[in-house]
């Protein structure tokens, strides 16, 4: 399972004229399930994402996780957006292959599982809409961007 996480000042996702998710300071995570991924892989990726220290402490060092973005216990937002293109195979030709991505039904199930697990462990979780054509807006903070990947 893959997540491309970006530290943001704010972010939102829209489907048509409707805002489906919006956060202030926190993490925007583009999330992708790959073929063969399991609930255990989703749990492992979520634990890594929630514990990843990408927010600055009082000394300016990236040392704080999204659960404590100010060093005083304030949790940042988590905006989860499904994006199967992260699994693209780009090794040959000029057209990406999406064979490595989980099939849509399994991708949707794993994304829903990931969102439910995140909501159980973090106070501020917003989402996009699986399979929809979404418009994602964000203000990067840094920019600070990391590719997180776990194998089943």
Swiss-Prot record:
<dbReference type="Pfam" id="PF02580">
    <property type="entry name" value="Tyr_Deacylase"/>
</dbReference>
<dbReference type="GO" id="GO:0019478">
    <property type="term" value="P:D-amino acid catabolic process"/>
</dbReference>
<comment type="subunit">
    <text>Homodimer.</text>
</comment>
<dbReference type="InterPro" id="IPR023509">
    <property type="entry name" value="DTD-like_sf"/>
</dbReference>
<keyword id="KW-0963">Cytoplasm</keyword>
<comment type="function">
    <text>An aminoacyl-tRNA editing enzyme that deacylates mischarged D-aminoacyl-tRNAs. Also deacylates mischarged glycyl-tRNA(Ala), protecting cells against glycine mischarging by AlaRS. Acts via tRNA-based rather than protein-based catalysis; rejects L-amino acids rather than detecting D-amino acids in the active site. By recycling D-aminoacyl-tRNA to D-amino acids and free tRNA molecules, this enzyme counteracts the toxicity associated with the formation of D-aminoacyl-tRNA entities in vivo and helps enforce protein L-homochirality.</text>
</comment>
<protein>
    <recommendedName>
        <fullName>D-aminoacyl-tRNA deacylase</fullName>
        <ecNumber>3.1.1.96</ecNumber>
    </recommendedName>
</protein>
<dbReference type="GO" id="GO:0005737">
    <property type="term" value="C:cytoplasm"/>
</dbReference>
<keyword id="KW-0820">tRNA-binding</keyword>
<dbReference type="GO" id="GO:0051500">
    <property type="term" value="F:D-tyrosyl-tRNA(Tyr) deacylase activity"/>
</dbReference>
<keyword id="KW-0378">Hydrolase</keyword>
<feature type="short sequence motif" description="Gly-cisPro motif, important for rejection of L-amino acids">
    <location>
        <begin position="142"/>
        <end position="143"/>
    </location>
</feature>
<dbReference type="GO" id="GO:0043908">
    <property type="term" value="F:Ser(Gly)-tRNA(Ala) hydrolase activity"/>
</dbReference>
<dbReference type="GO" id="GO:0000049">
    <property type="term" value="F:tRNA binding"/>
</dbReference>
<dbReference type="GO" id="GO:0106026">
    <property type="term" value="F:Gly-tRNA(Ala) deacylase activity"/>
</dbReference>
<keyword id="KW-0694">RNA-binding</keyword>
<dbReference type="InterPro" id="IPR003732">
    <property type="entry name" value="Daa-tRNA_deacyls_DTD"/>
</dbReference>
<comment type="similarity">
    <text>Belongs to the DTD family.</text>
</comment>
